[in-house]
């Protein structure tokens, strides 16, 4: 009984309970205010109906993805009172504008440190004009150049990435930068944490940035202060506050580790035990990552520093040159192919992550193989995949057989029949696949953090590694074909037809509001 009451007390007085109660209090206050004015209900209803209609017209004319427009317009016309209030609260842009302005200024001030080597671009122009145009676009509008002299090691599962990361962290001499969406205490984080503390004692500069929502209920209260006391410089990106606001949508979904400026890790693997199968949640957890060494690491170094200084808020720029690699023995003198690490921000007008994916799809000639944990594509992605399949390209896509979110799976299933009818082959992995991979035509591949859903494509800070004619491209392909043969089941039109009417109705409703989920 003592254990029960202790557990109950922990739940009642937990940070999560406090946040839920504060959010609930705000909702109840709005409802109370509305019902207090019930004697004027007719006037209020007609006023909000007019406001809802005006907002619907305003949204219709915004330069925004049509799916977002539809997700707001339907409730504004159907339930104008609550939808109008929700719209004004959830799209309040003051906080977003402040962060956006800081982000724009920081990217502009760091641009001189991310200059494209024109010789590399000239060589690429001769070799492949399509990739050349993509590199020019990402450099000009994303702010990240493409590199040669960069090696890539591909990891098929989180366990491989973890082992390599531990090995490289132990070799750190100057600095370690970590930026992750999720950190959870357990075997994985405990081992990394121990290394970081030891390195900080040795004089290595250690910085950690983690998302305030992704790790909200996984770490103790004020955990960043504990790490600071251990010599680890730490910031929490956009700490979750119990306020109804649009800024809570913009999360730092990146996974970056940079060591001494010569080595970087990127991919889908967070710092939690399920990512290395030390804890089972949804069957076998399949994830992927890459380790890059060489010139291309600089993009990840600057990506981290940009975000760090925005969150730090002191407005002081680093002496960025101090983070250039000093140990040239770790730098490859030459390496085949081209590597482009890039980031994507929800606070600008460029959907870099989606456009890189669309470029791969539109330029594919033989095949496109994709893995994604969340399949909620917008019309542009669906149209591009359909056109590729109809034109004879082998388009295959793997999603989880065991989902981590039931409603996401329900929405994903609503796309199955449509995509299969277009010629896309869809498979489900017999576990949970968290890898975000694209590979095409034995030439190009992307491994990173960008899912095929609205949150990744439009709302989150993301990053990925684009590879062209790098040996690791063939490893990404081989991994896809291996799990396709051994661990996947193909979804057929018959499977889609067997879904119950209720299941299809739920999917249809959820799909309308999927941009807001």
Which residue stretches match the model-derived regions?
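A short, conserved beta-strand element enriched in hydrophobic/aromatic residues
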Residues: 287, 371-372
